[in-house]
């Protein structure tokens, strides 16, 4: 494997030995406001208030709220390995573990495992966030502090990270042209150019994008016997404005209030800024997270996220169902109970399609038969019509190299 300090091809993540500040050495307080320990303890009071607010506004069947926060270790040149931490249940931790406590995702998962006790009714998951500005770390084989993942680390990631954010106000993290993808749609909402030789920051890495992450998972499955990168995809706004789901382009209010401005300013580059640093021009209106849950409650939605029955959009409220099976007939599309048929004969989005039992009975290999898919999509009535439905296939060849192909399976007139 690659060692720290070795030269790697352009767009490949270079493991780096980073040292992160701990709260004891960080100027959390204003002068005269007390010791860092005092300010650190005060943060628990704020976290307790957020937990109370989540419970106060949670109304099963009407509005579901979760206690959650953003874990935000920073990297050089504005990069970050951010993750959203979302809790469910009772007896949640008294302290929100931050990047001043732990410097890597592995340490975060370990800390949360120790403080969120499933036996006491507490559960959690983490969601990779703003991956396109992670300088390749999210789907690399290395942690933030330059250490390789162990098998135990991968198992922890598999358990605690079932979904990933692929679209938000700072662009798309699904795929990028020139980074293992030839799909023209991968040029959508890109804010950085692919890395050139010698670049280690401020550019797009192949392991910053979800499609490559899924393919890395296939490689790891061959090596480890399990796939720690089996995840569903969601979108989000990341505006920090408190207006969840407000992703309309025609009513764009930008990020965090301070960046809001007239269109003429947003479309003007700031002299000397790199494109990805120009917050005004290179913001989208944000994305949406969709979850197929049995009911609008914490337990139902959280369980659906754990089983990865989720999808992302770049803002429109598109309806989407997707199933995989071994024997779907074309007539399913005309069936009045198509979803029930697909559910009975296959697995939904995020599921795992097991080997074909009928092929085993006939003493055939599952590889000799191809899986079948059922997909149904409906446009947002307040947005543009749907143009096409595509199926993207990723695989690993006999030499361990990853590939992907894109096929149109339905197109508009």
Regions inferred by a protein language model and the residue ranges of each:
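A metal-dependent hydrolase metal-coordination microenvironment
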Residues: 1-142
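C-terminal functional module detector
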Residues: 39, 51-54, 69-76, 116-124, ...
């Amino acid at each position: 494997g690659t060692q720290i300090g070795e030269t790697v091809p352009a767009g490949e993540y270079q493991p780096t030995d980073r040292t992160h500040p701990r709260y004891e050495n960080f100027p959390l307080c204003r002068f005269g406001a007390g010791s860092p320990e005092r300010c650190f303890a005060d943060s628990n009071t704020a976290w307790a208030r957020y937990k109370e607010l989540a419970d106060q506004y949670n109304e099963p069947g009407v509005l579901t709220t979760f206690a959650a926060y953003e874990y935000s270790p920073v990297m050089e040149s504005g990069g970050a390995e951010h993750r959203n931490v979302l809790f469910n249940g009772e007896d949640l931790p008294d302290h929100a573990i931050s990047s001043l406590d732990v410097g890597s995702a592995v340490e975060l998962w370990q800390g949360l495992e120790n403080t969120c006790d499933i036996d006491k009714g507490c559960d959690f998951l983490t969601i990779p966030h703003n991956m396109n500005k992670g300088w390749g770390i999210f789907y690399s084989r290395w942690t933030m502090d330059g250490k390789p993942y162990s098998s135990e680390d991968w198992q922890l990631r598999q358990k605690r990270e079932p979904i990933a954010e692929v679209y938000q106000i700072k662009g798309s993290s699904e795929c990028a042209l020139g980074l293992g993808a030839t799909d023209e749609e991968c040029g959508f909402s890109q804010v950085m150019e692919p890395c050139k030789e010698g670049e280690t920051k401020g550019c797009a890495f192949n392991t910053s994008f979800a499609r490559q992450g899924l393919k890395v998972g296939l490689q790891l499955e061959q090596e480890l016997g399990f796939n720690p990168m089996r995840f569903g995809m969601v979108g989000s706004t990341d505006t920090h404005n408190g207006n969840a789901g407000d992703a309309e382009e025609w009513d764009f209010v930008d990020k965090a209030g301070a960046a809001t401005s007239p269109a003429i300013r947003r479309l003007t580059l700031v002299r000397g800024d790199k494109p990805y640093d120009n917050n005004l021009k290179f913001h989208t209106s944000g994305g949406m997270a969709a979850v197929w849950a049995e009911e609008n409650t914490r337990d139902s939605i959280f369980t659906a996220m754990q089983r990865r029955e989720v999808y992302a959009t770049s803002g429109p409220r598109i309806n989407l169902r997707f199933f995989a099976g071994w024997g779907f007939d074309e007539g399913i599309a005309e069936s009045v109970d198509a979803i029930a048929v697909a559910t009975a004969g296959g697995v939904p989005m995020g599921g795992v399609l097991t080997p074909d039992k009928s092929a085993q009975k006939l003493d055939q290999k599952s590889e000799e038969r191809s899986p079948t898919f059922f997909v149904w999509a409906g446009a947002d009535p307040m947005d543009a019509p749907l143009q096409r439905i595509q199926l993207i296939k990723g695989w690993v060849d006999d030499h361990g190299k990853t590939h992907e192909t894109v096929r149109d399976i339905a197109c508009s007139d």
